[in-house]
């Protein structure tokens, strides 16, 4: 059976030139005369590519499929994963000609170090990673390693990594400014006993902002509860036991706020006439705007952050000029307060 080298020898060209011709890459590289001579040699020798060569040619014509690992903590925040996927899909829709696989990699909080795909991505065919929901311990781990694939952090910050985030303390402080501007003097806080960095930053920003604006938050008006509607119900019931109640309640999640609104309604508290309620908005806005009354929130743009992360991944994997000299990309998105009937 004639080989590629036999064809090359008969045509008076190199084996590489014959390979280019067979793979349809002769245009601009091989003269018309040489192409004719190669074709004549192929016919004269009755050359047939080997099965392996045919398979290689077939594979070369298949577009490369990139695989992106999304690391998401396996805890109550899993309910927010749909917003992240919506953002990733929005990014992918901008580049429909580039195929991607997205793999969800759940990990236990504080145990990101167990995810071998970050340090040995070739074992899992990962081309890039998006990392979300990291704890302080997880951040320390990330600070100690140097992944050899593009990595972007979602709502977390390390200077050596690319990230798309918001200023969580600024977000909390903006709500404090709104309270002070409306003339409120005392506030209660319903919050989770949270190990989550972003949640703690938002609450810290809110409390610090209140203090700087002269809005009092008495110690007895700080209620720790579960991050759920049941947690909000319990916090509201404890709040109603106070002899002197603040005029406004801040909740560090809309799940807590929705439970609180229900408990206040059951107790005959008129919102916002008797009490105003504001919250951080984590879930879909359709949830908070359909509460009774509709809830005032400062929305965490989770979908937009996820879209920005995926935009970065696509660029890092497909933009050859960037891939040749990559620098961390740091993006900070703005947040907005949506004032609804729960606050006046």
Question: What name fits each language-model region?
Answer:
Residues 69, 123-133, 188-191, 243-256, ...:
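Periplasmic-binding protein-like
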Residues 73-83, 103-113, 164-174, 190-237, ...:
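Hinge/beta->alpha junction and helix N-cap segments in small-molecule ligand-binding domains
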Residues 1-57:
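N-terminal helix-turn-helix DNA-binding module of bacterial transcription factors
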Residues 62-177, 181, 240-241, 294-299:
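Alpha-helical recognition/docking segments in bacterial nutrient-uptake
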Residues 186, 217-221, 271-277:
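Short acidic capping loops at alpha-helix termini that bridge into adjacent secondary structure
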Residues 237-344:
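Flexible loop/turn connectors
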Residues 15-19, 57-77, 178, 186-193:
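Short beta-strand segments enriched in small/hydrophobic residues
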